[in-house]
């Protein structure tokens, strides 16, 4: 079944080939995608890139692969770890309506499913290679983090 609009939520710290795989898979099921960039209000070692930086990574990658025209919008979503209802309300305000969501984050999926949102989960793409924790660690240890980013950002 083809849906009109889908939603992908992620931190994208940074946007890497695994995320590109998710976008490509999702676009097989929808006409347009909304990308919600989570943890927009957090800056720490697990969230080193700002929303604006992550949005640029996403746009550049999707433009390179001629997918940017399939993105309805890219929005920022702040974390509210103790208030799932408020988080979902903020998500709805920023994204508007969507028909389906895609992802593997069980906390996010639980919030969405408890509110009647259908979720499609895809197998993770080369998780041993494309995992944000490992990529961020490699960036931290590198004398030239830009080379590491080029290695992982599609």
Language model region names:
Residues 1-154:
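Nucleotidyltransferase catalytic core that binds NTPs
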């Amino acid at each position: 079944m083809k849906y009109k609009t889908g939603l992908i939520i992620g931190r994208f710290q940074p946007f890497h080939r695994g995320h590109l795989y998710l976008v490509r898979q999702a676009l097989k099921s929808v006409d347009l995608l909304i990308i919600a960039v989570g943890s927009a209000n957090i800056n720490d070692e697990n969230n080193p890139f700002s929303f604006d930086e992550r949005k640029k990574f996403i746009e550049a990658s999707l433009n390179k692969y001629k997918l940017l025209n399939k993105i309805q919008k890219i929005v920022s979503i702040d974390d509210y770890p103790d208030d799932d209802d408020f988080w979902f309300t903020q998500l709805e305000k920023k994204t508007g309506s969507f028909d389906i969501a895609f992802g593997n984050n069980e906390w996010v999926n639980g919030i969405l499913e408890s509110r009647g949102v259908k979720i499609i989960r895809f197998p993770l793409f080369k998780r041993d290679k494309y995992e944000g924790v490992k990529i961020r660690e490699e960036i931290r240890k590198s004398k030239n983090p830009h080379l590491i980013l080029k290695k992982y950002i599609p």
